[in-house]
Design a protein with these regions (language model features):
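Beta-strand/loop-rich accessory regions of lumenal/periplasmic or secreted enzymes
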Residues: 76-94
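Acidic, serine/threonine-rich low-complexity disordered tracts
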Residues: 1-57, 88-171
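Hydrophobic, well-structured mid-protein blocks that either form specific transmembrane helices
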Residues: 42-82
Length: 171
């Protein structure tokens, strides 16, 4: 298959004692041509703040051109969009924020092989941590994730992090 399109739609809110403390609604689309990202577009409303990314691959310069709510400029094609569907996030030194377009340097560390139980099924996975390289970033801007990866099927099975409580994503 020549072209692949990945769409992502998210909408949720967190309420505490009836008051909304966090709210996100967004949509994104990634386009790949023969495994090369050629465009990424997203619009997100996060706590009433509009955020966006418009990224295109410049074939002549072999770079990404990014117009985002937090970053405008170019980026190396070694960057990966920081979405959880692609295991390539574990193989790069930096990622592009899927919400704002900012570029974040990261350190990925292999923790070990584990077995996890998801939906009453046991999976053999590799456990990694993914953290911001720049520890001077404010804590709420840092990358700090635990990731469980099924290397047999090339699928990230679970992600967890702490921010206003424990968040976990399962596939």
């Amino acid at each position: 298959k020549e072209e692949t399109i990945v769409t992502n739609q998210v909408r949720f809110e967190v309420k505490l004692l009836g008051a909304t403390v966090f709210q996100v609604e967004g949509y994104s689309e990634e386009k790949y041509l023969k495994d090369q990202l050629i465009s990424y577009n997203s619009k997100t409303l996060q706590n009433d703040k509009e955020k966006f990314v418009n990224l295109v691959f410049d074939k002549d310069r072999n770079k990404f051109d990014i117009k985002g709510s937090s970053y405008n400029g170019e980026a190396s094609i070694d960057n990966i969009i920081g979405n959880w569907w692609s295991h390539k996030i574990l193989q790069t030194n930096s990622q592009i924020s899927p919400i704002s377009g900012s570029i974040k340097q990261q350190i990925v560390t292999f923790v070990g092989k584990e077995k996890i139980d998801l939906y009453n099924k046991i999976y053999n996975v590799d456990h990694f941590t993914l953290k911001s390289k720049d520890i001077s970033l404010p804590k709420d801007k840092r990358l700090d994730f635990d990731i469980w990866y099924d290397s047999k099927n090339f699928i990230i099975k679970k992600i967890s992090y702490q921010r206003m409580g424990l968040w976990e994503y399962y596939l």
